[in-house]
Every structure is written in structure tokens, then in C-alpha cells.
Amino acid sequence: MLVYLAEYLTQFYTGFNVFSYVTFRAILGLMTALMFSLWWGPKMIERLQMLQIGQIVRNDGPESHFSKRGTPTMGGILILAGVFISVLLWGDLGSRYVWVVLFVLASFGLIGFIDDYRKVVRKDTKGLIAKWKYILQSLAALVIAFYLYASADMTGETQLVVPFFKDIMPQLGGFFIVLAYFTIVGSSNAVNLTDGLDGLAIMPTVMVAAAFALIAYLSGHVQFANYLHLPYLPGAGELVIVCTAIVGAGLGFLWFNTYPAQVFMGDVGSLSLGAALGAIAVLVRQEILLVIMGGVFVMETVSVILQVGSYKLRGQRIFRMAPIHHHYELKGWPEPRVIVRFWIISLFLVLLGLATLKLR
């Protein structure tokens, strides 16, 4: 929004031209989202406590989690508000890249809100029925997948980038829709499964978003894109604003979500942020790289699949409890140790993912 005002004011003072630079607006976007989260966080926590919107803890979970019962949840609203305000202020609202991610955040955030509302307000421990949750996620993801496929006017927009191989970028054709769908829905649910300990999901989300900010910047500049053998995507640089807004809002939320948490993000936060990472990966053609950089999310998801599959096929469990972070808790690891070690793994995987941009 302010881009257009600055563009108009440039005719009176050329210094306003600085707002045309994505990097400058990205920094402002990060700071805006961060300060918003820090400023409104205490107010939101107080409001959630007053409304008695508290976390419901399963009786069959780790005993250490019983003390979390009643902790304010649905704090993801704070993250989404910070991201939206920041992007609307500093982003180029004429960019379809921006609106695609905002649509994903809003639609998956609404699904998560309904799920949380049923759990904490209507006291329905199951929340939104899994079938309906999946249907709604699928509808939102397919809308984006079909839109991106139909609106693609450059070959790079529907190519698949394969890490480590600079000359392997096959055209996906109609399979683009399938890949985009599974990337968005899969990422959404993977982050949701990871969000089980204080700060466990938000920090890897911040790291992956920061990495995608760099990738979006490189993909939006023809010289960098050609040098690194990335698809050149004109206008993709605006995704930098979105990514840094997620980083800022996420760090601001972590201020209150770090152990012991004062607030949880709830499904309204985890489903929307996961879907946003998936959508950004699709937009910059880095679906495989998301699997690498978001390896912690993948690990958590695979642990659940293996646990359920093993129990149904053999009647035996592989882990003491799934997702896998609970397994380590039941082994006696203190919660902060599990969290920080998963953060370290996430940092390593993000750096590995960024290294693949050059290791081709």
C-alpha cells in the first residue's frame, strides 16, 4: 500500500525512491510484524484468558503436559494479523504472488479457527471432523493449484527444480496441479503435527520462511537466477516481503510461546503457516527443497504414519508415542532439550537446503 504513496511522493523528493527496493521494504516488513506481535501479544493473551480460551490436554499424553491445561490458545491469530498488516503496508498489492499467499493464510487460518473454536469453546475434543477438515483444505489448495496452472505464462512457472542437478528441470504439465495440491495440504498438516511443544513449530517455520525469502529474491532477479540455474520468475521478489513478515510475526509470537509458553498458536496458526510455506515453495518452484529444509516437519509426519501403520498391521507401536517429539519426552528428555535439539536439526537442514542452490 505504501509503495504507491512513496511512488507518488518521489516526484517531490527522490529519497522516497528507497521504497521501490524489495530489500528495504522486507526489513520494514519484518520489523512491523515483529513490533506488532510484541505490542499486541500481552493484550491478546489477556483477552484469551478472559474468554477462557484455554488449551485442552489429552489425558493419555505425557504427564508433563498436564500443567499446560488451560494455557491460552488460538494465538495464531496474532501471527496472522501481524503478517497481514505488514504485507498490506509494505507489499506491492498488484502482485499475484502476494495475494496467493494471503489467500492461503486466510483460508487455512479459517479452517484452523473453526477447529480450535469447536475444541475450546464448544468443548468438542475432536474439533472439526477430520473428513471435513481435509475436504476444506483440499478445496482451498485446489483453488490455488488450478489458478497458478491456468495463469502460468512462462515455462519456469511450471517446472520442477531438482536439487543438486542444474540441468534437470522437467515441465510438469497437468501434474503441476497434483504436486501443488499435495505440497500445500501436506505442509499444512505437517506443521500442525509438529506444534506439540512450546516453540517447537514456530522456530523451524521462521527458519524456512527466512530461507525462502532469500530464494524468492534470487528467483526474481534474472542475473542471480541464471547464475544459480533457477527458474527466473519476474515479480517473485515480492514474496520476500511475505516471508520476512512471517519471520517477524513468528519471532514476536515466540517471545510468548517459548518454554514455558504463555500462549499456543493453535490450529489457526499451524495450519495456515504450514500451508503458506507450501504455497511459497510452489510459487518459487522449490517443492523438493521444502522437504529438505522442512525436514523436522517431515520427520514428525513420517513418525505418525509409521506408528499408525505399524499398529494396524502388526499390533505393535514403533515409538512410545507419536509424533516423535513425544517419544523423546517419554524417554525422559526435558521438554526444552527436545525443542532446542529439534531447532538445531532444523537449522542444519535449512542450511543444507540453501547449499543445494550452489552445489549443482
From Swiss-Prot:
Pfam families: Glycos_transf_4, MraY_sig1. Its cofactor is Mg(2+). Pathway: Cell wall biogenesis; peptidoglycan biosynthesis. The chain crosses the membrane at residues 21-41, 74-94, 97-117, 134-154, 168-188, 199-219, 236-256, 263-283, 288-308, 338-358. GO terms for molecular function: metal ion binding; phospho-N-acetylmuramoyl-pentapeptide-transferase activity; UDP-N-acetylmuramoyl-L-alanyl-D-glutamyl-meso-2,6-diaminopimelyl-D-alanyl-D-alanine:undecaprenyl-phosphate transferase activity. Its EC number is 2.7.8.13. It catalyses: UDP-N-acetyl-alpha-D-muramoyl-L-alanyl-gamma-D-glutamyl-meso-2,6-diaminopimeloyl-D-alanyl-D-alanine + di-trans,octa-cis-undecaprenyl phosphate = di-trans,octa-cis-undecaprenyl diphospho-N-acetyl-alpha-D-muramoyl-L-alanyl-D-glutamyl-meso-2,6-diaminopimeloyl-D-alanyl-D-alanine + UMP. Keywords: Cell cycle, Cell division, Cell inner membrane, Cell membrane, Cell shape, Cell wall biogenesis/degradation, Magnesium, Membrane, Metal-binding, Peptidoglycan synthesis, Transferase, Transmembrane, Transmembrane helix. It is found in: Cell inner membrane. It is a multi-pass membrane protein. One of its GO terms (biological process) is regulation of cell shape. One of its GO terms (cellular component) is plasma membrane. Belongs to the glycosyltransferase 4 family. MraY subfamily. This is Phospho-N-acetylmuramoyl-pentapeptide-transferase. It comes from Shewanella woodyi (strain ATCC 51908 / MS32). The gene is mraY.
